[in-house]
Amino acid sequence: MASIEIPLHEIIRKLERMNQKKQAQRKRHKLNRKERGHKSPSEQRRSELWHARQVELSAINSDNSSDEGTTLCRFDTFGSKSDAICDRSDWCLDQ
């Protein structure tokens, strides 16, 4: 049996083409998932936090601050400061 001699540069070129093809497949797969609406876990968490803040803010805005005996409170939600209306019996910061 005769052995087949393949030049090294041919092998390297084939490996590079295989690698480029695999990268293109991954890129297409990622784009297709985005088009279908799939989100990565970090994107989902960011979205959930954003929606939670919007719900919280809309609940705060729906409560009128015209009630007597209320003051503006600051509390920590999801690592950021936000304002809320609370009774003076709660822990409040008068502003």
Swiss-Prot record:
The keyword Transferase does not apply. Residues 38-49 have a biased composition (Basic and acidic residues). Residues 8-40 form a coiled coil. Residues 16-49 are annotated as: Disordered. It is found in: Host nucleus. Its main location: host cell. It holds the Pfam family Cucumo_2B. Acts as a suppressor of RNA-mediated gene silencing, also known as post-transcriptional gene silencing (PTGS), a mechanism of plant viral defense that limits the accumulation of viral RNAs. Forms a homodimer to measure siRNA duplex in a length-preference mode. Binds to both siRNA duplexes (19bp) and long siRNA duplexes (30bp). Belongs to the cucumovirus/ilarvirus protein 2b family. Homodimer. Homotetramer (dimer of dimers). This is Suppressor of silencing 2b. The lineage of its organism: Viruses, Riboviria, Orthornavirae, Kitrinoviricota, Alsuviricetes.
